[in-house]
């Protein structure tokens, strides 16, 4: 087969997904397409590497060496073996998935478990439900995938990674309301990586990693800057089982081998610990779920990992619980983070005491207000909060505010950051100086004088001098935040009577 182009790869992957249209809801595409893509890829790479061993030393030599391959496929569990089946195809796929998962356990490295395919194909029940996935539908998708050889020679890891990320984005477009659970706008993620500037040999962590896009973009930063990236250790935790599997497949298909992705509730059961403390990392990126109400506040109030040093957040908003988890996960010397949050964390009265303590810690480095519509199913503007445990001397006692709400483009109903937007914002963070109507360095004393408010508009007047402009998305978001706070207060009062 001829080498596949990146555009052909994207096109054929999406056409395979569209075989499911009308059969299942669009939000469920990822449950089937990602495992099949991963299965096809590892089967073709296995064949490619096995053929190299045969050419090197013959069939017997290849059989011995196949046990040392990065991913092992047991006899009878290859893509071609499943392709030959015409009845109960879903059940046969499940058997192959389980056999491959069991044949590839995680390995131990530096006292932790790395890689491994246990559970990577995600939930299995849907495959054997013939009402949802009849044999002819599964066979059609398998035949569609079989048109191309997805070996490393035909499709290098970086191109496969691009195609996978493309598919994640397409599924987000199609999934609508559920997209934000697993996908963060990649141009925003690229900005966060540019601000934090990952380095070789560092440990990078995302406590709510979704499909792994923030981790991938951090490695892309190193690749794009010509720096060594394979020495980077990658860690993530994701509460959704299918989504954590998608993240692991994403990392594998991007050529990443040194990673640990855990499935579980980060607030209740943090996966990465060191004795009685959380493990710490050089760099943390996160887009925590916004203002969730269903979380174990009572356990956090007596958190055994010491993550409530600012206080215990209200039941109706877990934002500062995630914030404190992230701060506790930062290395004291090299630790830095970039977090996507709703603007409310900057000014809500119910979190005032926690915000005051945060300001006094002097780890806040930059607060960036970004444009509206950059998130699926959310028209609101958000902010990026950058913290550093060990701020440079000239930044101590000061915080940089950036008003980047106008640094956004929109095309085909999709909002995104252009390269020039990313460059402008990232350079402003690095220079840490005033820019008229865009950036302002503010002392902690001045923040105290402003009642410890951290909202960007408190410190930067970006309005037109000749017009009284009302920013409707910002005003609407502020109204929503106030309404939610009022509702929470009413609920609290009602419990007293």
Specify the residue positions occupied by each region the protein language model found.
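Non-catalytic alpha-helical coupling and interface elements of nucleotide-dependent molecular machines
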Residues: 38-44, 150, 168-172, 223, ...
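A conserved structural/catalytic subdomain of Rossmann-like adenosyl-cofactor enzymes
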Residues: 2-4, 275-497
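Non-catalytic, mostly N-terminal accessory regions of nucleic-acid modification and defense proteins
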Residues: 1-200, 262-271, 369-372, 396-403, ...
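Soluble or luminal CAZymes and related metallo-dependent hydrolases
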Residues: 8, 12, 239, 318
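Conserved S-adenosyl-L-methionine
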Residues: 178-286, 291-299, 306-308, 321, ...
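Short small-residue beta-strand/loop micro-motif enriched in glycine and branched aliphatics
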Residues: 172-175, 229, 409-410
């Amino acid at each position: 087969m001829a080498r596949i182009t990146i555009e052909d790869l994207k096109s054929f992957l999406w056409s395979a997904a569209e075989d499911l249209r009308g059969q299942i809801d669009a939000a469920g595409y990822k449950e089937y397409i990602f495992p099949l893509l991963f299965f096809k890829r590892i089967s073709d790479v296995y064949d490619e590497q096995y053929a190299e061993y045969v050419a090197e030393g013959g069939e017997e030599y290849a059989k011995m060496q196949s046990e040392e391959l990065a991913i092992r496929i047991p006899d009878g569990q290859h893509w071609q073996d499943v392709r030959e089946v015409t009845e109960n195809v879903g059940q046969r796929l499940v058997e192959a998935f389980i056999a491959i998962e069991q044949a590839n356990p995680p390995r131990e490295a530096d006292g932790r478990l790395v890689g491994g395919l246990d559970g990577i194909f995600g939930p299995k029940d849907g495959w054997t439900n013939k009402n949802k996935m009849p044999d002819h539908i599964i066979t059609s998708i398998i035949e569609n995938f079989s048109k191309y050889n997805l070996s490393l020679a035909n499709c290098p890891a970086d191109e496969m990674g691009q195609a996978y990320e493309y598919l994640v984005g397409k599924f987000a477009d199609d999934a609508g309301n559920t997209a934000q659970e697993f996908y963060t706008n990649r141009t925003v993620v690229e900005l966060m990586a540019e601000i934090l500037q990952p380095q070789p040999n560092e440990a990078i962590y995302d406590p709510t990693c979704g499909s792994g896009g923030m981790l991938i973009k951090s490695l892309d930063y190193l690749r794009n800057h010509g720096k060594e990236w394979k020495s980077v250790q990658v860690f993530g935790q994701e509460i959704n089982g299918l989504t954590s599997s998608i993240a692991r497949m994403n990392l594998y298909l991007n050529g990443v081998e040194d990673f640990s992705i855990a499935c579980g509730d980060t607030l209740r059961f943090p996966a990465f610990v060191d004795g009685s403390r959380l493990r710490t990392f050089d760099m943390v990126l996160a887009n925590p779920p916004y203002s969730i109400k269903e979380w174990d506040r009572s356990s956090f109030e007596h958190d055994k990992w010491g993550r409530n040093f600012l206080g215990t957040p209200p039941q109706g908003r877990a934002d500062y619980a995630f914030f404190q988890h992230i701060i506790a996960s930062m290395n004291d010397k090299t630790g830095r983070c970039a977090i996507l949050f709703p603007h409310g964390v900057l000014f809500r009265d119910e979190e005032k005491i926690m915000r005051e303590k945060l300001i006094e810690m002097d780890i806040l480095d930059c607060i960036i207000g970004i444009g509206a519509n950059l998130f699926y199913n959310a028209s609101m503007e958000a902010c990026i909060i950058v913290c550093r445990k060990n701020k440079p001397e000239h930044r101590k006692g000061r915080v940089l505010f950036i008003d980047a709400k106008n640094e956004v483009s929109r095309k085909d109903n999709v909002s995104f950051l252009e390269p020039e937007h990313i460059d402008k914002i990232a350079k402003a963070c690095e220079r840490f100086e005033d820019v008229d109507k865009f950036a302002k360095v503010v002392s902690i004393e001045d923040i105290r004088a402003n009642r410890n408010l951290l909202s960007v508009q408190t410190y930067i007047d970006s309005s037109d001098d000749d017009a009284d402009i009302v920013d409707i998305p910002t005003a609407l978001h502020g109204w929503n935040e106030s309404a939610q706070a009022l509702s929470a207060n009413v609920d609290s009062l009602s419990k007293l009577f």
